[in-house]
């Protein structure tokens, strides 16, 4: 399956759909993004819609199956497509977080602790104190 993200006028992802791979293959069997875009514009009768292909297996610029990463991250509703970076970027979670230009993922100004946690524990970011808090549920 091939995934495509539909963008609004501000390049925000408003929907993500999948199409069978055969839809995006040309006469030589080579996948072409434009074929998928044309298919979706016709299917939804939206000739002016903006669609971008996205890879379900890509996160942080790494393809989970060892394939070629595509557009840094799999698109999700509410994410932004950045044409300069050719990447999908999640909304900034906290004002202090910084975009990693290589992964297009947001990072806290202080790395999350790497200590091993129990099953009922997790770390959460405390923006006011600029620190990670260990929480037990």
Protein language model regions, located:
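Interaction-interface detector
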Residues: 1-137
């Amino acid at each position: 399956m091939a995934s495509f993200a539909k963008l609004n006028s501000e390049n925000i992802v408003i929907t993500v759909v999948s199409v069978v791979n055969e839809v995006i293959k040309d006469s030589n069997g080579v996948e072409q993004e434009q074929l998928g875009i044309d298919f979706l514009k016709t299917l939804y009768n939206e000739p002016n819609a903006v669609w971008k292909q996205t890879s379900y297996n890509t996160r942080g610029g790494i393809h989970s199956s060892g394939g070629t990463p595509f557009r840094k991250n799999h698109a999700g509703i509410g994410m932004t497509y950045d044409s300069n970076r050719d990447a999908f970027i999640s909304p900034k979670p906290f004002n202090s977080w910084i975009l990693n230009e290589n992964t297009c993922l947001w990072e806290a100004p202080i790395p999350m602790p790497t200590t091993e946690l129990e099953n009922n524990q997790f770390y959460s970011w405390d923006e006011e104190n600029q620190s990670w808090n260990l929480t037990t549920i």
